[in-house]
């Protein structure tokens, strides 16, 4: 019988000045084989007066749901928008019997509605905005989407395959050849966003990616701009090659980031690494 077993689980959005959390779980998809998943969460305040990043990891009837949000700095109550978004995603995902691209799209809609409702209640329609990334994992697939410039990367067999494209001015300039992809993180307009939660939409602005078949030796990274701006894709790849679980991958990247940002004012920094492996046999033995 298919079942989901967590050795440890985190159900609610979490935040504080600095957190490291490691979890491991087993997702059955056949009687004699299963997917082993471990994930690691890191968040830190950096040199900012408060941490406006939020995350949620949820065990759901359909599988696992990860949400990561970065409240817009310089705007009022960005951390509230980020927490509302993560709460809305977690609550929606926990009520779903199955995951799909439609479920991801609906999760973004629920998050947008939650932020707009709070804006209206507090007469604060021009502020309170956030990015949001969502990853849903069931027994067969990864469903994922984003809005803003927080990123999701995924890799297979230790090789990076794809990342979400930022909804930013610099990503747009890169698409038309005016900025090199590798230079996005250094561009003066990198924080000018074109899509976020908390701005009224005429039509949904979140972008969903094609589902990815869930398989062993698969890795996923969700991260805010305070993380990816200080590590290149080449460095992420090197760290991945030198790792065999989510915690080591995260620690390898954080070590490089600490070297790269020594002369910079550190932004809030939050990331989730997910490591998926195949297993065989009876785990109850």
At which residue positions do the language-model features occur?
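PP2C/PPM-type serine/threonine phosphatase catalytic domain
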Residues: 3-285
């Amino acid at each position: 019988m298919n079942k989901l077993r967590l050795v440890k689980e985190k159900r609610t959005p979490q935040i504080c000045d600095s957190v490291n959390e490691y979890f491991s779980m087993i997702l059955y998809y056949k009687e004699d084989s299963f997917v082993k998943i471990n994930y690691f969460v890191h968040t830190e305040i950096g040199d900012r007066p408060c941490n406006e990043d939020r995350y949620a990891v949820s065990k759901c009837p359909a599988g696992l749901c990860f949400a990561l949000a970065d409240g817009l700095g310089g705007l009022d109550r960005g951390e509230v928008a980020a927490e509302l978004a993560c709460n809305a995603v977690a609550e929606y995902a926990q009520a779903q019997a199955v995951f799909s691209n439609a479920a991801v799209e609906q999760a973004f809609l629920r998050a947008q509605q939650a932020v707009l409702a709070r804006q209206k209640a507090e007469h604060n329609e021009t502020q309170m905005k956030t990015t949001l990334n969502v990853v849903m994992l069931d027994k067969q697939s990864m469903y994922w989407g984003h809005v803003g410039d927080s990123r999701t990367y995924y890799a297979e067999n230790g090789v990076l395959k794809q990342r979400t494209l930022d909804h930013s001015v610099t990503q747009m300039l890169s698409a038309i050849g005016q900025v090199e992809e590798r230079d996005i993180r250094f561009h003066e307009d990198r924080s000018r966003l074109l899509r976020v939660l908390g701005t009224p939409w005429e039509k949904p602005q979140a972008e969903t990616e094609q589902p990815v078949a869930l398989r062993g030796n698969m890795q996923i990274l969700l991260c805010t701009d305070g993380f990816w701006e200080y590590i290149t894709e080449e460095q992420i790849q090197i760290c991945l090659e030198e790792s065999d679980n989510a915690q080591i991958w995260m620690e390898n990247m954080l070590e490089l980031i600490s070297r790269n940002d020594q002369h910079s004012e550190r932004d809030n920094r939050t990331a989730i690494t997910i490591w998926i492996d195949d297993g065989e046999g009876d785990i109850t033995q």
